[in-house]
């Protein structure tokens, strides 16, 4: 179920302060965050936000089409290495 429009988008306060500070200074430094639950707002456009995936920080460059999505959507947490191929020759009796 989507979030109510009267509540507005959720952004962690510490992340919002960091983005506002970067906008105020006019710089585009990488912002490191663990807040995967924060929604991307128009103030974040053009910034690179390093989102934690549980092991390392994945840099995400925010574009206009990402507004309204959550940061965690762009940093996958699971790595799929593929299924193991069957070795038919080894199964002979």
Swiss-Prot record:
Gene3D superfamilies: 30s Ribosomal Protein S19, Chain A. One of its GO terms (cellular component) is cytoplasm. One of its GO terms (molecular function) is rRNA binding. One of its GO terms (biological process) is translation. Keywords: Ribonucleoprotein, Ribosomal protein, RNA-binding, rRNA-binding. Signal peptide: none annotated. Pfam families: Ribosomal_S19 (PF00203). PROSITE patterns: RIBOSOMAL_S19. Belongs to the universal ribosomal protein uS19 family. Protein S19 forms a complex with S13 that binds strongly to the 16S ribosomal RNA. This is Small ribosomal subunit protein uS19. It comes from Pseudarthrobacter chlorophenolicus (strain ATCC 700700 / DSM 12829 / CIP 107037 / JCM 12360 / KCTC 9906 / NCIMB 13794 / A6). The lineage of its organism: Bacteria, Bacillati, Actinomycetota, Actinomycetes, Micrococcales. The gene is rpsS.
């Amino acid at each position: 179920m989507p979030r109510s429009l009267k509540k507005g988008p959720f952004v962690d306060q510490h992340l919002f302060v960091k983005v506002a500070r970067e906008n105020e200074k006019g710089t585009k430094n990488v912002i490191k965050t663990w807040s995967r639950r924060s929604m991307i707002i128009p103030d974040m456009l053009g910034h690179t936000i390093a989102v934690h995936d549980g092991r390392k920080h994945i840099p995400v460059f925010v574009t206009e089409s990402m507004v309204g999505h959550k940061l965690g959507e762009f940093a996958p947490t699971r790595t799929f290495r593929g299924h193991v191929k069957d070795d038919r020759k080894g199964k002979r009796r």
